[in-house]
């Protein structure tokens, strides 16, 4: 459904919402933790804790794997092992995807509100597109979205603004007519660079940093509590 007029989200008139996945819609920390701890023994490396993993989420699987290796190895050794490690990670992630994760409270209701208001919804994530679509389908959230674009969909990932600019172009809206809904400074930086507004979840990951230190038009404890005026 395409909005024939702007809908106010957090007081901002918009026609589209660009929504992050990990840490915003679904708590996927368990998936990342389980996958890494399947990967690491292949290289005789010890397991990592959830606390170590959460600090490294948000910039894509390549960053997550590279930084996890550096917990145990120096830069040179981590770089040398990385090509084999990322292949192993992707193989294990395909088997784990969705099995150790859960939809955050208020997300189905929040997506329903946004969709029913007439906003165009698109999911933009740094997760590979095939895994993003699989996860959304697994959690029964896929029907709300007109499109899903993963980290392999465009030449650059968030926090680069390119994915948001491309999403707006494909939706046929100006960036100023879209709001980014996410959980981290990566989402905020991408939105700022693209010229979109941003609303941020207080329950996400954000590299262990207080989210309210990142400028946004709104902060929300549940997606269904995000202010919406039709």
Please tell me what each predicted stretch does:
Residues 106-118:
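Catalytic-core regions built around general acid/base machinery
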Residues 60, 99, 117-118, 214:
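Structured helix-beta-strand junction loops
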Residues 2-5, 10-21, 25-109, 130:
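N-terminal helical cap/lid subdomain that shapes the substrate entry/recognition surface
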Residues 1-15, 112-115, 129, 133-230:
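Asp-based, Mg2+/Mn2+-dependent phosphohydrolase catalytic module
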Residues 22-24, 32-34, 90-92, 118, ...:
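A generic short-segment signal for beta-strand/edge and adjacent turn/coil regions
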């Amino acid at each position: 459904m395409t909005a024939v007029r702007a809908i106010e989200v957090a007081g901002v008139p918009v026609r589209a919402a660009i929504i992050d996945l990990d840490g915003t819609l679904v708590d996927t920390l368990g998936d990342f933790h389980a996958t890494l701890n399947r990967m690491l023994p292949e290289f005789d490396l010890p397991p990592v804790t959830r606390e170590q993993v959460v600090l490294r989420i948000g910039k894509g699987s390549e960053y997550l794997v590279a930084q996890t290796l550096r917990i145990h190895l120096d830069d040179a050794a981590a770089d040398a092992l990385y090509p084999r490690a990322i292949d192993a990670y992707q193989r294990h992630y395909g088997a784990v995807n969705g099995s150790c994760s859960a939809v955050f409270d208020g997300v189905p209701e929040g997506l329903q509100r946004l969709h029913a208001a007439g906003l165009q919804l698109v999911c933009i994530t740094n997760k590979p597109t095939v895994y993003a679509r699989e996860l959304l389908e697994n959690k029964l959230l896929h029907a709300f979205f007109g499109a899903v674009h993963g980290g392999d969909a465009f030449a650059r990932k968030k926090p680069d603004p390119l994915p948001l600019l491309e999403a707006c172009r494909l939706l046929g809206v100006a960036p100023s007519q879209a709001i980014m809904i996410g959980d981290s400074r990566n989402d905020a930086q991408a939105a700022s660079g693209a010229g979109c507004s941003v609303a941020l979840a207080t329950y996400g990951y954000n590299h262990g940093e207080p989210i309210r230190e990142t400028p946004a038009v709104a902060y929300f404890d549940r997606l269904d509590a995000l202010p919406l005026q039709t």
